[in-house]
Amino acid sequence: MNRSTGPLRTLRTLGLLGLGAALLFLAACTPGAEVTTSQAATTRELVLVQGPDATSQALGHAYRDMLADAGIKARMADPAADPIGEVLAGRADFTAAGSSRLLAALGKLPGAHGAHGADAAASGASADPTTDTSATADAETPGDLDAAQTKRELHALALKGFAVLESADAERTGTLVLTAATSAGDQLVDTSGLAPLCPQLEFGIAGGIKTELTAQLAAKLDCHPKAVIELGDAQARGVLPVISDEVQIQATTLENSGIPDNALVVLQGAEQLFAPASITPLISTDGVGQDAVKAINKLSSALKQEDLLNLNRMATGRDALEPPKAAADWLTDKALVTDPR
């Protein structure tokens, strides 16, 4: 009896080892995000990088705090105009970016392929209403992919040395907004009624996408504005131009448009003019373990559109908090960390 247990014990051991390896893979198999890592624990300090605007910085600090709460050393790098490029160049390990921008950048990597290859990546990118970094600088027109299709294409890419983690149920997708007074006065609630009114309306659009978006307005909606006012990056990240009636319609992002205090009306149907921008983390897999993947996915899973709106308001409102403080307070309110900073 005892003699027979040796081989059985060996088989059991091998089976458990195989099961352990499978579990290490499955631990990161969140919906739409499969990540293979060779280790359970992260072995080095991770560097996170985000764009320069306050909301991006607050989001980065929230992920950093989640990693720290899991016992992982992590720090924020200086803000970057092209955070995705910083990760791909090896100067950072993490960024949370819009899904279309990620798809456009990652689809160009050698060996990357999705359901339709690199062409699908290119077709999924279009105008970001506030910035124009190199990840999508070559995307001149909106693609044919909606938000769900973009995420599927993104998570289907085969990446070496990098991984796309779980997308949040929150977007920074572009949209068009107007004041409630303008909406009521012109009976304007969706893009189908925009064309005859455009010659009377001034649009505010960030400089980086002004040419492209103006062309899309004409091509898709037969909209030819009275004037297109070019907004600087700082102006475009807020909604003061439309609130102050400097312009009647402004291109902004969903987390800006939904703040109740601003009493803005989102023009329905405007999504056809902008690339989907679901918040999606990109990580380097070098020295990154399942502990980091789990911590990052935990935050992404909890992040909903209302949460992004609240975080944005905390970081950019009238009594704005510094991004690290906004992130810490938001995480505490959501009970996502065991040791609030």
Named regions from a protein language model:
Residues L24-A28:
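C-terminal motif of bacterial Sec signal peptides marking the signal peptidase cleavage site
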Residues C29-A33:
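Bacterial signal peptide processing site
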Residues A41-S56, I72-D78, P199-I205:
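Short, well-ordered beta-strand elements
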Residues H61-D69, A81-T95, A215-D222, G232-Q250:
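Short helices/loops that flank or line small-molecule/ion binding pockets
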Residues Y63-A70, T191-E230:
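Ligand-binding cleft/hinge of the Venus flytrap
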Residues L106-L165, E246, G258-E271, P276:
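Ligand-binding "clamshell"
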Residues D132, T136-I205, S301-Q305:
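A conserved helix-loop-strand patch within extracytoplasmic ligand-binding domains
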Residues E171-A184, P276-Q290:
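A bilobed periplasmic-binding-protein/Venus flytrap-type ligand-binding module shared by bacterial periplasmic
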